[in-house]
Amino acid sequence: MNYSIIFYIIGWILKLEAIFMFLPGITAVIYGETSGFAFLITIIICLALGIPLTWKKPSKKAFYTKEGFVTVALSWIVLSIMGALPFIFSGSIPNPVDAIFETVSGFTTTGASILADVEILPHCVLIWRSFTHWIGGMGVLVFILSLLPLTGGYHMNLMKAERSEEHTS
């Protein structure tokens, strides 16, 4: 198993998620919301984890189906946990399980929510919640595919890991 390429891709995903969190952070500044600090803290955490993972390109770029499965699974886990942190840190959804549920619901475009009245949330949190749905709508696979040049041409294995059972031959 080529762990270096897996962690390298996860590092880039963390950095991209941090970039996506800048818009809600800017929204917080515009509206004068203190919830914006939740995004600042989460951006710092994402970058603190992502930058070291991408510091050095992996020397071995082999990326096969098993690495694809691990990368996709870890991507979902990392995106969901990091995406839930602004909800938790802002106090909008203080229960971590509920925050992760809300985030996973957004990234998977499920549409389920634990929130009875989303309009009471701060603007920056609403933007982030909408962003998770948008990212999910464009597809986490497309999000990850932007990183495929890093795999040295082994991206078909990542696509095999993400496709559904009904398409598997």
Q: How should each PLM-predicted stretch be described?
A:
Residues M1-S169:
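Membrane-proximal intracellular helices of multi-pass ion channels
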